[in-house]
């Protein structure tokens, strides 16, 4: 009977521990079905009013080509000129998403892709009130945008931002949004993983992974912890069919806070830089540099007189941590840097020739030299109609390019211009013109003014070197 008595005694003993030692009770594992019966209703009533539905309208242009454009007879006489003059028609496109009120005066956080190109934005509150809203700022690289409700009278409920570094795998969370436009919906789940990188969602990859159901329309909605605070902005799902399969991703609030601080005042996001590039240490790399296991980021390029260079970091060093946080890939390293205020100091832990070392460096903004000097090219040349600028580390960071690139970059191309017809694209970097290396805008203008019989233009397009030959 001893075994039976122990079975009866155990729950009573555990209950005694929970009452007597509250700290023990905070982390206990439920021992019965009754203990895990709980309701999120009080929490939902508290946080749901701060989550809004967002409806956008924009005019899109559709190009339609006549089948005659591909007829050999017409192509014999007109070449590709007909195909380069598309018939266009416009239509209004409606989209939906979600957002989170983070200030009582109507400041809302959502995803950049929710409001991209929107001409009209309508925000619908949980009490069905509707407001027009405007974009205060947007950051494509983090897929975050800040909205402001127009003509707001009174104050609105809002969510405070929690330190997302306090989250642990297994924590319960709620996802709130407007999936498929059916109306505000709440789902629950746990934090499945932290610091998810290389998931191909946007340029700056560093996500909270959750199994709380996230579906189309949830984008921009809230991921909320059980203390009623915002821990992430729901951004994307991993799905082959478009519906939730239990793998959702949210942008952590530490990233959100950085963008909010920069954009809320109408400015632009200025991200700190380290003046270096590296790659995650693989098993092969670890073996080649006599490391016991593959950890950290191997530095393979250092920008002269940049922050890492001045701090004494060298090519071949392996960065293993920033302050108290470990890093194992370049995305994690970048996240730990860019979520800190410019002007602060950070401790970098690294391995050099098998020995662990640390150094402190000051966080800085990337330099804006050379000056961008935006210029539109005109005249009789194949680049007519492009807006160009000098490429600097600051500009490279804004558009997600390597800080080691230099030269003249195409920022915009006028619709129907010769440059568009010749196939130039936004963010092409002009490297050479007729064999001469292009180092700046003035030099490029001088080379274009010579009017040769033909132009041979070498460009860097997303890392690929291409050459275009255009005859006069």
Task: Please provide the spans of the model-predicted regions.
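Bacterial N-terminal signal peptides that target proteins for export
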Residues: 2-12
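Low-complexity, intrinsically disordered Gly/Pro/Thr-rich segments
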Residues: 440-458, 464-465
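Acidic- and glycine-rich mobile interface elements
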Residues: 298-303, 323, 404-421, 428-437
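Conserved catalytic motifs of ABC-family nucleotide-binding domains
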Residues: 316, 427
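Glycine-rich phosphate/pyrophosphate-binding loop
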Residues: 395-400
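Bacterial N-terminal signal peptides
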Residues: 11-20
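Short, low-complexity, Pro/Ser/Thr/Gly-rich segments in the mature regions of secreted, periplasmic
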Residues: 463-471
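Serine-dependent protease modules
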Residues: 25-315, 321-347, 351-384, 389-394, ...
């Amino acid at each position: 009977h001893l075994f039976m008595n122990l079975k009866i005694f155990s729950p009573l003993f555990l209950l005694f521990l929970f009452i007597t030692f509250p700290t023990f009770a905070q982390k206990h594992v439920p021992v019965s079905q009754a203990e895990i019966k709980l309701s999120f209703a009080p929490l939902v009533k508290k946080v749901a009013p701060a989550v809004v539905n967002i409806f956008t309208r924009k005019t899109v242009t559709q190009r339609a080509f006549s089948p005659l454009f591909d007829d050999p007879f017409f192509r014999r006489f007109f070449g590709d000129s007909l195909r380069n003059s598309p018939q266009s028609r416009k239509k209004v496109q409606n989209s939906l998403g979600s957002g989170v009120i983070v200030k009582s005066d109507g400041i809302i956080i959502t995803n950049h892709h929710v409001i991209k190109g929107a001409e009209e934005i309508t925000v619908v509150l949980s009490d069905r009130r509707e407001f027009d809203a405007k974009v205060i700022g947007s950051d494509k690289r983090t897929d975050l945008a800040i909205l402001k409700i127009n003509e707001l009278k009174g104050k609105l409920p809002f969510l405070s931002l929690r330190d997302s570094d306090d989250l642990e795998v297994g924590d319960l969370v709620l996802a709130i949004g407007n999936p498929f436009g059916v109306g505000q919906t709440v789902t629950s789940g746990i934090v499945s993983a932290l610091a998810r990188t290389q998931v191909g969602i946007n340029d700056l990859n560093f996500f909270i992974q959750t199994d709380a159901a996230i579906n189309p329309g949830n984008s921009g909605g809230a991921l909320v912890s059980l203390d009623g605070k915002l821990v992430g902005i729901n951004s994307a799902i991993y799905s082959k069919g478009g519906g939730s399969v239990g793998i959702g991703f949210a942008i952590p609030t530490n990233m959100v806070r950085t963008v909010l601080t920069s954009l809320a005042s109408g400015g632009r996001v200025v991200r700190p830089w380290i003046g270096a590039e590296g790659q995650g240490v693989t098993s092969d790399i670890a073996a080649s540099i006599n490391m016991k296991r593959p950890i950290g980021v191997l530095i393979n390029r250092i920008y002269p007189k940049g922050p890492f260079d001045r701090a004494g970091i060298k090519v071949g060093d392996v960065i293993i941590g920033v302050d108290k946080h470990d890093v194992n890939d370049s995305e994690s390293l970048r996240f730990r840097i860019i979520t800190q205020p410019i002007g602060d100091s950070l401790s970098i832990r690294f391995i050099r020739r098998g020995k662990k070392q640390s150094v402190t460096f000051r966080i800085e903004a990337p330099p804006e030299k050379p000056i961008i000097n935006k210029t539109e090219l005109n005249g009789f040349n194949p680049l007519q109609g492009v807006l160009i600028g000098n490429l600097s580390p600051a500009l490279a960071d804004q558009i997600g390019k390597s800080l080691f690139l230099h030269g003249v970059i195409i920022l915009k191309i006028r619709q129907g211009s010769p440059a568009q017809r010749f196939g130039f694209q936004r963010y092409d970097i002009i490297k050479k013109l007729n064999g001469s290396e292009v180092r700046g805008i003035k030099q490029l203008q001088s080379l274009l003014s010579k009017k040769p019989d033909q132009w041979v233009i070498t460009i860097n397009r997303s890392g690929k070197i291409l050459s275009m030959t255009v005859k006069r």
